[in-house]
Amino acid sequence: MSTDPQTVNRTPSSLAGFGRFCQSTLLLLIRIYFFWQLFKIGLAKLENIATPIGFFTKLGIPFPEINAWVVACTECFGGILIVAGLATRLAAVPVTISMAVAYWVADSNAVLNIWGHPDKFVSAAEFPFFLAALIVLCFGPGWFSLDAIFGRLFRRKSED
């Protein structure tokens, strides 16, 4: 191991840079994998809106027509915005709320017993989308996103 001060001082920053690269890569993979699926689910709901309206009516959800449109649009447009990394955190807010409500409506027992029966909580169909939305909401889209590209462009212009 080198004790050269230049090497020692450079190592933490290069390790941190590698960590940021890995973080951004993981965020990109999460965005593409989960939110492309969510986009397709939302698009299918928009193409056949009668199905979610009927499902929401059967569940006793108030204003099933309005809620079906809101959920379908949130999943479709929120999903594609998050995949692109455009207005990512803003898009993640309604997606997170929608997944939380879906979780509660589909299986409130799993939500209430998260500590007693965590296997039931994490095996619910809503869990991966809810977790992915929380991750993107908390950590942002990473370097590989339109948000990051626009951020770099605007910073560069403001420095000129």
Q: Each predicted region: which residue ranges?
A:
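Extended, low-polarity transmembrane helix blocks
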Residues: 1-47, 65-73, 77-80, 84-160
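Short juxtamembrane and helix-loop transition motifs at transmembrane-helix boundaries
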Residues: 49-62, 89
